[in-house]
Curated annotation (Swiss-Prot):
Gene3D superfamilies: Aspartate/ornithine carbamoyltransferase (3.40.50.1370). It comes from Photobacterium profundum (strain SS9). GO terms for cellular component: cytosol. Catalyzes the condensation of carbamoyl phosphate and aspartate to form carbamoyl aspartate and inorganic phosphate, the committed step in the de novo pyrimidine nucleotide biosynthesis pathway. PANTHER family: ASPARTATE CARBAMOYLTRANSFERASE (PTHR45753:SF6), ORNITHINE CARBAMOYLTRANSFERASE, MITOCHONDRIAL (PTHR45753). HAMAP family: Asp_carb_tr. L-aspartate binds at K85, R168, R230. One of its GO terms (biological process) is 'de novo' UMP biosynthetic process. This is Aspartate carbamoyltransferase catalytic subunit. One of its GO terms (molecular function) is amino acid binding. Heterododecamer (2C3:3R2) of six catalytic PyrB chains organized as two trimers (C3), and six regulatory PyrI chains organized as three dimers (R2).
Amino acid sequence: MANSLFQKHIISIPELNRSELELIVETAGILKAEPNPELLKNKVVASCFFEPSTRTRLSFETAVQRLGGTVIGFDNGGNTSLAKKGETLADSVQVISSYVDAFVMRHPQEGAARLASEFSNGVPIINGGDGANQHPTQTLLDLFSIFETQGRLDNLNVAFVGDLKYGRTVHSLTQALSKFNNINFFFVAPEILAMPDYICEELDEAGINYSLHASMEEVIPELDVLYMTRVQKERFDESEYAHMKAAYILTADMLAEARDNMKILHPLPRIDEITVDVDKTKHAYYFQQAENGVYAREALLALVLNEQL
């Protein structure tokens, strides 16, 4: 099948339309069920992480190898000769892109992936995270996990809990789900970490339902998806953090009234916002979600590097 993602830069979720998101999710399901080690044969993919990463880097590199491709790159850009010699990002991208067929990049600077796309000589840039801005491939694996567990991406009740102000994963997933029909959002956070105004304004303009809550227990019975995030300790003094943390810890007892189909997602790492007794419940899906990062990234790479599948 032909696809509009061929040779496309993957910089942010708003630049992907519904049909493209559905194509990635569908392809991820196919590749999870039927691995294809020929899709990236003779392809070289750069995996360039200018700040440390575990899940994103390893799942991308696993995806490339499972599809028959070759990976080059680095995991800590600050220790590379290009950083120590003061080479600009633009120059680094121009050089590295001349070696490869696709360029996966994480960078602490917001907007770095878009800048890279201007200097890559047409080689597709895939944003593995640029500061607090965007993390589109996390959103793709989140969508795949939701579809896998719910059988749909329309008609969902979805709650986001914790740090909704600084969490790039919740911003991107909200924007992605907004492209589907009849989505109801529940934003559960302390006022100081509430969903940014620009996200709420986008939802208002699109006529999408959302509500604000201080407690997750009041919304759990209504949910199909509960998306947990950690409250970041560095945002508070010790006493404030202790109070905030206690208000947003999910325990197994709190799931007594949850729908049978409700699944709990988390971008990881988990600190203490989900207690370990939740792991054995039928609702926990965050470790399977992390595994799905391989299949979602396989799908994306296959579509970006193959005009037809």
